Amino acid sequence: MKMSDEALKIIEESQNREKLKQVIDLIEERLVEHAIVPTELQWTILINHLNEMLKRSQRKETIPVVDRDLFKEVSKEAITISDEIVRSIGNLTDDEIYVLSIHFET
């Protein structure tokens, strides 16, 4: 996947660089499986989001509770990918699954 200089900078400056790279690799595999091809901008936004998720996981912080009804139109595939990513990061609430899922909608 082609990444912007900004995305590469986020990765390079991440306090969780190795874990971030692992999560990105996992996402790349899932995107290929589901024929999802993000733009450079979408990748940059996603990588920034993942970096923030890793920080929250490490600091044991949570996001505000989300209304899951707002995500009822999100595909099962997007939710499944998100669930796997949230579980692989660990120490995050299920609300993260729904917020992350929008990155995988086509």
Where are these regions (language model features)?
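A cross-family "folded-core" feature that marks the main globular domain of proteins
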Residues: 1-106
